[in-house]
Amino acid sequence: MHSPFLTPGSRSQLDNLALLQLRRDQTIPTILQLHDEKNGGYKEGKVTNTRFGSFPHITLCDQPWGSQIIASKVDTGSRGRTQKMKRKADELDSSTQAEDKPSPQTPVAASSGFLHLLYPTPELWTASLPHRTQVVYTPDYSYILHRLRARPGSTVIEAGAGSGSFTHASVRAVFNGYPSDDQPTKKRRLGKVCSFEFHAQRAEKVRVEVNQHGLDGLVEVTHRDVYEDGFLLGDPKTGKSPKANAIFLDLPAPWLALKHLVRNPPEGTESPLDPTSPVYICTFSPCLEQVQRTISTLRQLGWLGISMVEVNNRRIEVKRERVGLDLGNIRGTVVFPKSVDEAVERTRALEERAQLFRATQNQSDGDSTPAPKAENEAKGGQQESEVPVYKQGRVMTRSELDLKNHTSYLVFAILPREWTEEDEKRCREKWPSNRVQEPQGPQKSKKQLKRESREKRDLQRKEQSQPETESQKE
């Protein structure tokens, strides 16, 4: 089964996840099915009811992604009508064959509203998922995955699955093909996410979502207390190592789990880290006291490049504001004097019109108001500007009010690959270099080198002084 998060295809399919976008900030996730086993009763099959109308799933299946779906007329009262429990004798005789599920009734379009059918992405899933715990939003996990060097083929350890937001984002980052039972033609490392959750109910819900979204084999959810049992897959003592390249700890006390993330565990068990590459780690902590204890433990365990980052993402809306009396009733403009000169000119034009009106009222033989002069028309009329419309006005910026992230501190660190003298010797034999000179004999100290250089200078001075004495004797 292919996941709609990774390979959605061009059309929606049955038994797959789809996102129903009602507004910009309102999206409903649903599994497309013709029949709803839990909430039956609709003649049209499974129906999703929204404030913009009812949408039978028969109208959502096999539709191109991004389509606009019109609401349908659904008999909502049919769900409350109970079927007759007693049947006549002739009905009992005729019911010898097994009853199949009735085919959904063809819906009729309504004028209540519409929605857009979208395929799921980690960004849309984060905005629409059911919140069970604190959610890692897009501004946070995008930066975290960048700093963790998550790429196709990597293995990520996630401690604290929660609502599954980071799980879906990380599996997309490391995806490098679906696992299969066939023997691969070439050696290729498939990406994988190993998620650990302490709460049993949350772990089960994440496991169900992973199954529904077609991520089996790419995400492995484990119910475990990582503080005590570590990060091995299967049995905590004799389990298999995930050989992780990146680690994300969303825990209340991440420093308690760092003792299991070492190259050589003291208990003699296998390390969960990849021995052939450096390992990147990130911890998600809301308090500075947690950050201090985490950094102290990281330094004791040999982690390098430790840094702390706080992500403050804010969306900025940029637009042009046009102000002036000559714009008329154009949408998005402010009909107000843009300067003092324009206000004075407008006042003078109104005074001239008032004087002209009073002058015509005093004339006894005047039947109608005369037409304004050409000068007044030029002043009072609108003048077309030579500046294009998209360049008119001032550039205005407004920041987003509601920030979809959390005030938390991200701690990053790197654990280098373990390197021994045997590894150094093997690499020098495999890739020799003429510039590297092997030291011969025992190394000399600085004092010994200074003494030898002083003796060498004294010897040179003696050799220079001998020819001078011989010439004087002659």
From Swiss-Prot:
Q: Which GO terms describe its biological process?
A: tRNA methylation
* Catalysed reactions, semicolon-separated: adenosine(58) in tRNA + S-adenosyl-L-methionine = N(1)-methyladenosine(58) in tRNA + S-adenosyl-L-homocysteine + H(+)
State the EC number(s). Answer: 2.1.1.220
Instruction: Report biased composition (Polar residues) as residue ranges.
Output: 358-367, 434-443
**The keyword Transferase is assigned to this record:** yes
- Domain of life from the UniProt record: Eukaryota
Provide the protein's localization. Nucleus
Keyword list (alphabetical) reads: Methyltransferase, Nucleus, S-adenosyl-L-methionine, Transferase, tRNA processing
Q: Which residues form a coiled coil?
A: none
| InterPro entries for this protein | SAM-dependent_MTases_sf, TRM61_C, tRNA_MeTrfase_Gcd14
MF terms (GO), sorted A to Z:
tRNA (adenine(58)-N1)-methyltransferase activity
Q: Name the positions where S-adenosyl-L-methionine binds.
A: S163, G164, S165, E197, R202, D225, V226, D250
UniProt biased composition (Basic and acidic residues) = 423-432, 450-474
Task: Return the Pfam families for the record.
Answer: GCD14 (PF08704)
Q: Where is this region: Disordered?
A: 75-109, 356-390, 423-474
Q: Is Methyltransferase found in the keyword set?
A: yes
Quaternary structure and interacting proteins, as annotated: Heterotetramer; composed of two copies of TRM6 and two copies of TRM61.
Tell me its family.
Answer: Belongs to the class I-like SAM-binding methyltransferase superfamily. TRM61 family.
Function (record text): Catalytic subunit of tRNA (adenine-N(1)-)-methyltransferase, which catalyzes the formation of N(1)-methyladenine at position 58 (m1A58) in initiator methionyl-tRNA.
Question: Would you tell me the protein name for this molecule?
Answer: tRNA (adenine(58)-N(1))-methyltransferase catalytic subunit trm61
Query: Lineage from the top down?
Result: Eukaryota, Fungi, Dikarya, Ascomycota, Pezizomycotina
Q: Which gene encodes it?
A: trm61
